[in-house]
Amino acid sequence: MTLNQIARGVKHIVAPLCLLLAAGGAAAAPELPRLVERDGKHALMVDGAPFLMLAGQAHNSSNYPAALPKVWAALKDANANTLEMPIAWEQVEPKEGTFDFSFLDTLVRQARQNKIRLVIIWFGTWKNTGPGYLPEWVKFDNARFPRMKDKDGKNVYSHSPFAEETLALDRRAFVKMMEHIKKIDSDHRTVIMVQVENEVGTYGFARDHGPRAQAAFEQPVPAAVVARQKPKVAGVTSGNWTQVYGDYAEQYFHSWAIASYIESIAKAGRAVYDLPMFVNAALREPSAKPALPWQGNFASGGPTYDVIDIYKAAAPHIDFAAPDIYMPESSKVSLILDSYKRPDNALMIPEMGNAPAYARYVYQAFGMGAIGVAPFGLDYAEYSNYPLGSKFTDRRMVEPFAKVYGVFAPMQRQWARWAFEGRTHGVAEGDDRAAQTVEMNGWKATVSFREFQFGERQYLKDKNEFQSGTEQPGGGVAFAQIGENEFVLAGQQARVKFSGSGANDGKPSMLARVEEGSFDANGKWVMERNWNGDQTDYGLNLPATPTVLKVRLGTYQE
């Protein structure tokens, strides 16, 4: 055999081997994160399995390398697995046409080092309804990048959603960012989701009155909007915005205009790198149902609960709308969660206050199937957002959330799967401190608060005597029904009593076994001790330290 023949033979072996190795390398890349829905339940799939975001959002000005050490330290102390971090248009394109993604490089690299996933928040045309994060060359050139006009034709603080060049350049910068994320992260999937703009809408102005906006306002309402957002004028099914929606016309129109603007950006970004995308909402008063017409009392045009359907119609490349919760009242939080948890809208809380009172709502949200929760300002920058959040900027701020996240962290994958399967429920202690009931398959749980761990309230001489440390509401419990008669529950500062319901209604029942423990890295339950006797005779009394129990129940014949 000649040397040429040997060389040709080696080539025939090596070439297929190279293709095989290349295919193996490609197959090793993690699956792209995606949001999935099944039977009205949702899951954020990360690395091919449901993922529970134990998240925190950094302060607005922590998006620079020098601030990151204080961010990672706080997330570690919080037992968090995800960081929400803003990337601003002014930051990446300070000079028109020149892009700088060096901070994004640093952020992604350090996130991997700290084993943290990322949700990128795009501060573009709108941040808290304003133009603060636009590049200077956009902010002040109102001829090229027009602002909204009021009824008198005067400029207002927010830029117009009908400004074609503003949209085109916001979209270009966003696409550049998505291209860069794909370039640096497609083999790792550190970045799992993107928020497009931030708390859009306008305070004090119902809509844009500029020439383009006025012309659009007088046009027929798009059929896709009418199909989802029920007309407010009786007997009308088509027409312009006023004809179809009457007193609601201006708010609905502004919502459609902004949602359409966001859709253009999201669609272009997903064409480059198809990560899940969402919008967040500065909320209106949740107790106003049915919602009243806009009266200057909230940000018109944002994805408030009453216009989610308009956003669904105008922005199909946005996966869901999410509430920013800075209302500590338990009744309002429940209304908000109920409004945003929909079969067509995944529940997530991208921002909420970082004051201690908010920590208990993590149990309620995760029990309701939320894919993630993120207290705002969860870093050690010496900046407090009190009174919306905590007075503290150190570990005292993190601690209430660290305790709750600490019980979910070992079972984060299991919990996300159970929620996707519709097995979970949750409650948070109400401001009225009243007991709450949770109906599950065959069983009912009654959750009460401020109880002593031993005995019943009627045993007390002073019926106004309560367990110390419960002066402020802080209890919560999340349940997962993992079998016909078996539950995993996590909670704190609460008493849980089970009784038969549904098929077990009226049947004598009792606790078969109660184990305290946790899940190991492989998802296997590890028992630490069995509860019985005094620890179960008066219900399951969860202490101030968050605790995980595995409970098995049974019925018997009288």
Outline where the language-model segments fall.
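Polysaccharide-binding and catalytic clefts of secreted carbohydrate-active enzymes
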Residues: 143-308
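Aromatic-lined substrate-binding rim segments of carbohydrate-active enzymes
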Residues: 68-142, 258-272
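Aromatic- and carboxylate-lined catalytic core of secreted/periplasmic carbohydrate-active enzymes
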Residues: 363-500
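N-terminal signal peptide c-region/cleavage motif recognized by signal peptidases
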Residues: 22-23
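N-terminal carbohydrate-binding accessory modules
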Residues: 29-81
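The substrate-binding groove and active-site-proximal loops of carbohydrate-active enzymes
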Residues: 53-63, 86-104, 152-172, 242-259, ...
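Catalytic-core region of carbohydrate-active enzymes that cleave or remodel glycosidic bonds
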Residues: 116, 263-275, 306-410
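Short, acidic/polar
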Residues: 61-77, 299-314, 332-333, 359-362
